[in-house]
Amino acid sequence: MTVNTPANPDILALGEAMIEFNQSAKGEPKYLQGFGGDTSNFCIAAARQGARTGFVSAVGADHFGRLLIDLWERENVDTAQVRVDPQASTGVYFVSHGPDGHAFDYLRAGSAASRYAPHDLPLDAIAAAKVVHLSGISLAISLSACDAALEAIAHARANGVRVSFDTNLRLKLWPLNRARAVMLEAIRQTDICLPSWDDVTELTGLTGRDEIVDFLLSHGPRVVALKLGKDGSYIATPDERRVVPG
């Protein structure tokens, strides 16, 4: 089952969205419900800037899945390619606050998004888009989701659709060696690469700003936007480099 809204997205993002429960105060057994998911957040942010966006994923046939669909519809994100999986639940995570900072606990094993597979992909919608966006989490949540993400990238490239990729490395989801191999495979087929400083130094072992973007550009992207936290971003193409302040 899919949920439909009347739109023709220029930007499609593939990944996982989750329900967040954020502890309201240290030591208090109260949690505020919110929403999480890097590619979902990307879609919402782009839609707020006027882009026509759509999300590609799966949610459970449950209350939390309905909450996510309602969120996207309020934010003008197309949900035509969101599957409702009657045999799985929507993933959730908890944020707790203690003396050592924030702690995250994820309940995503067997979730609808983690069950997503290549045969679920909306190939026609991908071919009709202008940009397909994915992240390291899109690749990491399960083997079938990884296969689907890589197939989406290949199909986009075969149809002249640009690919945007945010590294978003999460080593709780997969070991570094596998993350490095799979992400580099994705980066080789990426037009716009969006790594964070911490991610890319972990993945490459490099520590110089220019050597990092040289390495990434040599693997195929036409644009690298190296995210530097409060210092902004370092934007690099084969012909130009500049810092965009934060």
PLM regions: where:
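Conserved phosphate-binding/catalytic region of the ribokinase-like
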Residues: 1-12, 154-158, 205, 209-246
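Glycine-rich phosphate/adenosyl-contacting loop at the front of the ribokinase-like
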Residues: 2-78
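Short beta-strand segments
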Residues: 13-15, 105-108, 133-135, 166, ...
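Glycine/charged-rich beta-loop-alpha catalytic/anionic-binding loops adjacent to active sites
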Residues: 21-30, 134, 240-246
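Residues that scaffold the ATP/ADP-binding catalytic core of kinase and kinase-like folds
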Residues: 21-22, 105, 130, 203, ...
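Conserved N-terminal subdomain of the carbohydrate kinase-like
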Residues: 52-137
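Conserved beta-alpha-beta core of the PfkB/ribokinase-like small-molecule kinase fold
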Residues: 131, 137-214, 221, 231-233
